[in-house]
Amino acid sequence: MSCPVIELTQQLIRRPSLSPDDAGCQALLIERLQAIGFTVERMDFADTQNFWAWRGQGETLAFAGHTDVVPPGDADRWINPPFEPTIRDGMLFGRGAADMKGSLAAMVVAAERFVAQHPNHTGRLAFLITSDEEASAHNGTVKVVEALMARNERLDYCLVGEPSSIEVVGDVVKNGRRGSLTCNLTIHGVQGHVAYPHLADNPVHRAAPFLNELVAIEWDQGNEFFPATSMQIANIQAGTGSNNVIPGELFVQFNFRFSTELTDEMIKAQVLALLEKHQLRYTVDWWLSGQPFLTARGKLVDAVVNAVEHYNEIKPQLLTTGGTSDGRFIARMGAQVVELGPVNATIHKINECVNAADLQLLARMYQRIMEQLVA
């Protein structure tokens, strides 16, 4: 199958860019963008490669994405080696095919076609690309955004190429994401012998009523755009492994995926009040990995919906479900942020794949979005 989008996707898949190693992917993208008149600024931080590229001036539409991929797992379980792209029955297989090298290829080819047709486009077209979205993400998009904000860069619209679709490309568009807040909680007791409980203080017993009440809380009921806030206990650890020792500490880690009905400070206050109510001795550490954000109907959402309806003849659902994405950092710039990408059914799995025709369709959609906003 000869197609510039498929060919570029295959070239990217052949580069085993395990986070945060870019493995030469960005050099390939930069070469293509510079050839059509983009100015490229590399913005590397520690072991992470990033670049910010732009062409033109005025209202800015940025395309954002990541070159890194998650590990392939057991390569012997793949129908072909994970970094050797293969097309079977119209499906392109390879690690990163859906998440998100196919989107990157579609973005770049769309930009090439757009610039060829609109060499003097009125707005500014930009790219924000990182090699660390899948791992810690500490030195990726967040650092680039901080640098851009420090010099008052303008970003009006941002299209993130994360695989948003469920069954066919464009059936779901993400116009927001929930916030994510993790609590690392240690309940302190006194270690002792199980035969002498009066000489010890069992933190597991002490914490049980607190945890019971915590999991029963209805944090909110969500709203028009967000499902209800969810709290899940992810890890819990106590004890020495011996059956005759009362543990001295209990560690509990729980995560909130929260809507715009709450703030992280409101959640923290409620958890701390509950700890005090149960008279627990504790230490607590919080990690806020992202605030919730929402892009209401406006120029970007309308342009994306128009592009999907034009090429796939379906009306996309606007959803805020799923995990976090780098869109949470870009939203800080005041930009309208929307995610549109391929079907996500196989992301992070053995035999990750994407419908090759979907990538061609995605490139056309991306180009139509450019034409509506910065032509």
UniProtKB/Swiss-Prot annotation:
Cofactor(s) in the UniProt record: Zn(2+); Co(2+)
Species whose genome carries this gene: Shigella flexneri
Similarity comment: Belongs to the peptidase M20A family. DapE subfamily.
Cofactor note: Binds 2 Zn(2+) or Co(2+) ions per subunit.
Lineage: Bacteria, Pseudomonadati, Pseudomonadota, Gammaproteobacteria, Enterobacterales
Listed SUPFAM superfamilies: Bacterial exopeptidase dimerisation domain, Zn-dependent exopeptidases
The protein's name: Succinyl-diaminopimelate desuccinylase
Pathway recorded for this protein: Amino-acid biosynthesis; L-lysine biosynthesis via DAP pathway; LL-2,6-diaminopimelate from (S)-tetrahydrodipicolinate (succinylase route): step 3/3
Entry's Gene Ontology BP terms: diaminopimelate biosynthetic process; L-arginine biosynthetic process; lysine biosynthetic process via diaminopimelate
Sequence positions that bind Zn(2+) 2: D99, E134, H348
Catalytic activity: N-succinyl-(2S,6S)-2,6-diaminopimelate + H2O = (2S,6S)-2,6-diaminopimelate + succinate
Extent of the signal sequence: none
